[in-house]
């Protein structure tokens, strides 16, 4: 088998129900979600699978939730292939919080530590903009001059 690269997602790719089929059908995935719940002393899995979208979108929940789903997929792949992730993966990368997931995927961080770090990171990011209205817009296909005019 050729070695491959994995890029783990950042915040914004979350959706209620993500990972539920993994949880229901693979013991290794269930073990990941259970470990995250235990580390955070919270039933985050319930929020991930059945929760309110606004609750999942809270940065303090989103970050460990996305890590949990990604690591659950890693553990299922390891189990199905009968190989450690590092045996069939050449490189791991992550976008934003995905960097933590990539470290966890190669056992540089354990699931419990990654969960706790991402909760702290999520809380810090959430609190940094608590009383500030923020927005983000993606601009695709416009010339730089037009964008600069719009920003003035």
Question: Could you say what each language-model-derived stretch is?
Answer:
Residues 53-54, 90-93, 97, 122, ...:
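Short, glycine/charge-rich beta-strand/loop segments that flank catalytic centers
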Residues 2-93, 142:
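Helix-rich "cap/lid" substructures immediately adjacent to catalytic or cofactor-binding pockets
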Residues 66, 73, 102-104, 124:
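Hydrophobic side chains within alpha-helical segments
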Residues 11-14, 40, 84, 105-152:
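Alpha/beta catalytic cores of group-transfer enzymes, especially the acyltransferase/condensing modules
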Residues 95-104, 108:
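Glycine-rich nucleophile elbow surrounding the catalytic serine of serine-hydrolase chemistry
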Residues 61-67, 100, 146-152:
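Short, charged low-complexity intrinsically disordered segments located at boundaries
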């Amino acid at each position: 088998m050729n070695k491959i690269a994995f890029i783990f997602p950042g915040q914004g790719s979350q959706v209620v129900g993500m990972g539920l089929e993994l949880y229901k059908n693979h013991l290794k995935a269930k073990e990941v979600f259970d470990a995250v719940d235990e580390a955070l002393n919270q039933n985050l899995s319930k929020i991930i699978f059945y929760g309110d979208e606004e609750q999942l979108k809270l940065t303090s929940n989103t970050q460990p939730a996305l890590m949990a789903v990604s690591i659950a997929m890693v553990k299922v792949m390891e189990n199905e292939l009968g190989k450690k992730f590092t045996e069939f993966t050449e490189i791991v990368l992550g976008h934003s919080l995905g960097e933590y997931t990539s470290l966890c995927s190669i056992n540089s961080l354990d699931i419990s530590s990654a969960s706790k770090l991402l909760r702290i990171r999520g809380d810090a990011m959430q609190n940094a903009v608590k009383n500030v209205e923020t927005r983000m817009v993606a601009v695709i296909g416009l010339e730089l001059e037009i964008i600069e005019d719009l920003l003035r």
